[in-house]
Design a protein with these regions (language model features):
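STAS-like cytosolic regulatory interaction modules
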Residues: 1-43, 47-91
């Protein structure tokens, strides 16, 4: 299992880098550390949703932990449950 620390800002300016880093972890279980996230924008959310779908389709686990309060607050504002951004993989 690989752990990847997300940047403090997941927005237009940082989206390409985040996407590249996440794609580089394809094919293995992944933990995204969102503990330092201070801003989650719509594009950052889209990248995380796409990653969750890719990991689910591959039968791999994708977990987001730890999470900052700002990250959790953004999910509430977007109206999405954390489960939409994670994958349990195949047991």
């Amino acid at each position: 299992m690989t752990t990847l620390a997300l940047a403090p800002r997941l927005d237009l300016m940082h989206a390409e880098h985040a996407c590249t880093e996440i794609r580089a972890c394809a094919g293995q279980d992944l933990v995204l550390d969102a503990g330092r996230v201070t801003h989650l924008g719509a594009l950052g959310l889209q990248i995380l949703l796409a990653a969750a779908r890719s990991w689910r389709d591959a039968g791999l686990a994708l977990t987001i932990a730890p999470r900052s309060t700002a990250f959790d607050d953004a999910l509430v504002l977007f109206g999405l449950p954390l489960a939409a951004l994670q994958s349990e993989g195949i047991a």
